[in-house]
């Protein structure tokens, strides 16, 4: 007895699923310059490796003989694949079927996608377009009632954030629950001019008197600066490549350790120009990204959050092949001071490093927290202590190198002060409770005001204190462990990475990361 008839029926149903929302909807998707969800999976996954679950799930129509006449697939597909040879779970919204909204979705598929990633301990790549299975006002008509809002399965996403790498791509207009899925990730990327992200789109926002286009409301420039997404690129192909690169630094789950990459770059390579990079004039600034690129393995720095919290640069890199989480103060933004946005960015980044067992490297040039009315209105100190708490909760190996400024409470947060952390300083390092500039006026106000020539008195005090704040005086009392030749920075960092590698421990941490 053969079961060929049933297999033929299966193939017929799969053919319906391959048609997505139908030729007209697919054509509209393509005319908008966007790939269909199945094309995206092909581009993301290694060739021929995607194994789909629930392909023929959807809304079926039967004729008078109870024979299937039509099948509209659910607007979410998912399955297992490999990316650069590594197993992953891929899930994607099908915008050609009701714009990805709830009245054409099967919630169990969304939940099982998260469950599969968690159970198999594999990274999840989430391609989001539309409402991501979220509600539509048409749902009231199809169900005959209004639902009390709820998000079944969100607990799975929360668990996954602390267990597996979760990557999200915004590949069109994303709203409501779709926006939440995009934001609830370790790394997110949008497509310039073709993606938009918002809680509610322009037609809804118009009801409160704001008449905006999709890009004006939630385009990539808005969301990069808000920190809602980490990256924006020109094409979907570039977005998929960003995902590949991001995942290359991370383990499959917290139960594994990040893998070592190639060791093609000499770990003892000296960078001669670093000796001249920090200006002696403290009012002059310098570019720190070339310093990062010079000390890490060539071409290995992968920056995230470029437009948000800009006074600290964050990204992944490799040192002698070992993946590390790399932070660096950026003097070009608020002089390197920590703003409220910077604190939020650093908190998430430190939690990410701790979750996935990445040693942290921090190039420090921090004059302190941002000051002034804007800083107070933004709650900078509140965000700052949250960041400090995140740092003090870390157990992952940590290395700080003080390039220039290290002042105040934010300066003190260059490492976890409650445990051993590797620390060096360049000879350009300067530190204290407050910078002399500004601090002198506060500490010596009475003496300056009483002088016949207050300006001359202030200059006299400043000259006297400048002689005392030499980094060598701090080294004499072991307040700084080691002052190094900047040209040796790479070799010392590679030594840190090699020393740290066997100290890393797999498994979940004492706290679970939040998006």
What does each of the following model-derived ranges do?
Residues 1-515:
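Ligand-binding clefts of soluble mixed alpha/beta catalytic domains
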């Amino acid at each position: 007895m053969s079961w060929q008839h049933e297999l033929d029926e299966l193939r017929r149903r799969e053919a319906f699923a391959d048609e997505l929302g139908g030729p007209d909807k697919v054509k509209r998707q393509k005319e908008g310059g966007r790939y269909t969800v199945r094309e995206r999976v092909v581009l993301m996954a290694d060739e021929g490796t995607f194994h789909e679950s629930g392909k023929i799930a959807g809304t079926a129509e039967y004729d008078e003989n109870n024979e299937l006449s039509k099948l509209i697939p659910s607007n979410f597909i998912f399955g297992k694949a490999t990316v650069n040879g590594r197993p992953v779970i891929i899930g994607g919204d099908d915008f050609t079927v009701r714009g990805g909204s709830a009245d054409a979705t099967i919630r169990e598929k969304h939940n099982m996608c998260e469950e599969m990633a968690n159970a198999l301990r594999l990274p999840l790549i989430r391609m989001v377009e539309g409402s991501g299975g979220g509600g539509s006002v048409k749902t009231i008509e199809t169900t005959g009632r209004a639902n009390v809002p709820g998000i079944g399965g969100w607990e799975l996403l929360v668990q996954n954030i602390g267990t597996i790498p979760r990557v999200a791509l915004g590949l069109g207009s994303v709203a409501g629950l779709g926006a939440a899925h995009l934001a609830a990730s370790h790394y997110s990327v949008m497509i310039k001019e073709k993606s938009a992200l918002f809680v509610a789109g322009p037609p809804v926002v118009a009801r409160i008197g704001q008449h905006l286009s999709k890009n004006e409301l939630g385009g990539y420039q808005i969301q990069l600066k808000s920190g809602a997404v980490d990256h924006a690129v020109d094409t979907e192909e570039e977005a998929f490549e960003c995902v590949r690169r991001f995942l290359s630094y991370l383990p499959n789950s917290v139960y594994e350790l990040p893998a070592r990459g190639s060791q093609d770059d000499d770990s003892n390579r000296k960078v001669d120009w670093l000796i001249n990079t920090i200006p002696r004039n403290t009012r002059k600034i310098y570019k720190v990204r070339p310093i990062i690129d010079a000390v890490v393995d060539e071409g290995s720095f992968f920056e995230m959050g470029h437009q948000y919290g800009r006074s600290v640069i964050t990204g992944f890199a490799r040192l002698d092949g070992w993946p590390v989480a790399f932070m660096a103060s950026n003097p070009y933004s608020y002089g390197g001071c920590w703003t409220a946005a910077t604190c939020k960015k650093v908190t998430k980044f430190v939690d990410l490093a701790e979750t996935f067992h990445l040693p942290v490297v921090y190039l420090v040039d921090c004059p302190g927290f941002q000051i002034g009315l804007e800083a107070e209105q933004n709650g900078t100190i509140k965000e700052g202590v949250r960041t400090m708490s995140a740092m003090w909760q870390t157990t992952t190996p940590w290395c700080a190198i003080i390039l220039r400024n290290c002042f105040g409470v934010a300066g003190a947060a260059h490492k976890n002060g409650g445990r051993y952390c590797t620390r060096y300083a360049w000879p350009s390092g300067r530190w204290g409770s407050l910078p002399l500039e500004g601090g002198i006026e506060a500490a010596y106000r009475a003496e300056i005001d009483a002088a016949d020539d207050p300006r001359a008195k202030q200059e006299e005090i400043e000259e006297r204190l400048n002689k005392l704040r030499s980094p060598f005086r701090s080294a004499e009392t072991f307040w700084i462990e080691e002052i190094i030749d900047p040209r040796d920075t790479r070799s010392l960092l590679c030594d840190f990475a090699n020393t740290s590698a066997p100290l890393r421990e797999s498994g979940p941490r004492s706290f679970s990361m939040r998006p």
